[in-house]
Amino acid sequence: MKRIFSTDLPDKLPGRLVLFASSILAFLAGTTVYLLGRDWATTQFLSPVSAWQPELQVSFGFLGANLPSLCHAYTFTLLIILALWPARHARVTGAFSWLFVASALECLQAEAISDAVVIGTSWFVGSPFADGLLAYMTNGHFDVADLAATAVGVSGAFVATSILEEKT
């Protein structure tokens, strides 16, 4: 019977499952910090359900502001790398693609950039994509620490997959 996948798949499967599990744990940790440490009324996708926010609001300090960005970057970079894994340059492609996307979305929240995008997208006002993008830019705020957390999360996923590749 001819194999569809790479011949080394069964040997590397346990390590890939560990990486997948670590991405899920990181996602849950980031989501927990995000939900417990932020005001839902000021969060774009949570504002419709802000009345349901628990009264207990935990302060995570510096971690509360940037841990969700780090976990988000780690999780999505790792999932992209795992999805591309049989490809020769999966780690580099996955890491740089998510770093580009996350950094671009963060930079869109910078006032100078968002002002230019608002002017450029004025023709498309009323379309769901343009309205969503404009709401994201105006409700969010640019934070260099989020860019740094994204870089650390992407680097962590890159290193984790590098270690797996060396061990198997």
What does each model-found stretch correspond to?
Residues 1-168:
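Bulky hydrophobic segments
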